[in-house]
């Protein structure tokens, strides 16, 4: 999505504008390293995120470099992973402080980043994984990638379905890629002392906020 915006001459964060080389993700072999680079070295096969990556050579901050697993993963596959993988690992593990056995809900789970979140939650041993999408034709895909329950976030009863799934407690953690109309409902669907990690604005960046629900 961001690459299409930049290709059309728009901006994404600090990148963009007419003449900008497109690309946020890439993979390849390291040919040079700075003096203070840690954990990777010349010759390593890596996947990275950055800007202007659709080029023969690209520069990456070593903190955004991930070694490609020592298996048969090819560069094409690896180049599709860095942004989604880093974004969702940060949201679920670093900020969300997810613990094995907890319940998790991913709003906007049918997006590329959301699909990665389902897989991370599955690998980390979530007790129950709930994913949302407004497109019912994508429900089977979400289930195939780890969702135990799939809901439509525009269904007025989705919060009740979450509560029914979690013994009326709500989930331990919500990763919200939507914002907008989901903000107040998210608070209703979260367990007391649970966490909501806001990642995206696919449903809008401005909305009414119910302070009573937050209290």
Regions found by a protein language model. Name each.
Residues 3-52:
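Glycine-rich beta-strand-centered segment in the early N-terminal region that forms part
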Residues 108-109, 178, 201:
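NAD(P)H cofactor-binding loop motif with strongest signal on the N-terminal glycine-rich segment
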């Amino acid at each position: 999505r961001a690459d299409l915006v930049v290709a059309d001459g728009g901006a994404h964060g600090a990148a963009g504008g007419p003449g900008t080389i497109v690309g946020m993700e890439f993979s390849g072999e390291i040919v040079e390293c700075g003096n203070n680079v840690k954990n990777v070295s010349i010759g390593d096969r890596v996947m990275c995120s950055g800007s202007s990556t659709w080029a023969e050579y690209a520069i990456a901050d070593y903190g955004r470099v991930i070694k490609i697993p020592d298996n048969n993963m090819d560069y094409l596959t690896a180049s599709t992973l860095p942004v989604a993988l880093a974004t969702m690992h940060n949201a679920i593990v670093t900020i969300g402080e997810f613990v094995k056995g907890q319940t998790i809900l991913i709003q906007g789970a049918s997006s590329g980043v959301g699909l990665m979140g389902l897989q991370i939650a599955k690998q980390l041993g979530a007790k129950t994984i709930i994913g949302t999408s407004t497109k019912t034709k994508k429900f089977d895909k979400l289930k195939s990638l780890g969702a135990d329950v799939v809901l439509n976030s525009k269904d007025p009863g989705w919060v009740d379905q979450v509560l029914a799934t979690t013994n009326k407690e709500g989930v331990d953690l919500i990763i919200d890629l939507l914002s907008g109309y989901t903000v107040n409902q998210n608070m209703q669907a979260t367990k007391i002392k649970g966490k909501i990690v806001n990642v995206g604005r696919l449903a809008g960046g401005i909305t009414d906020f119910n302070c009573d629900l937050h209290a």
